[in-house]
Amino acid sequence: MGGRDLIQQFEWDAEKEKANIKKHGIDFETAKYVFNDEYRVEFLDSAHSTLKEFRYITIGFVDQMLTVIYTDRNDAIRIISARIATMKEARLYYDDNNKIYS
């Protein structure tokens, strides 16, 4: 993992983070560094987006492969949840990055 020099602003709900740690074992302070992964894969989470709020899924590497759900709010990235990536998500990451080297 490269340096931890984030330029984005991040925010999250502290109670939601506590619930996320209990459920997934990942704190949002760590999860925000997935945005430093220049090879991360991002796409719209259309199943959970609304007309008022678009949600996104990003898959990237911190110390392990993580999946982070977030939205853009008030010029900040608002983290909604974070967990260890599933095998399917890890495959998306590696398949997408194999295109770079092909």
Model feature map: region roles:
Residues 1-102:
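Ribonuclease/tRNase effector modules and their secretory precursors
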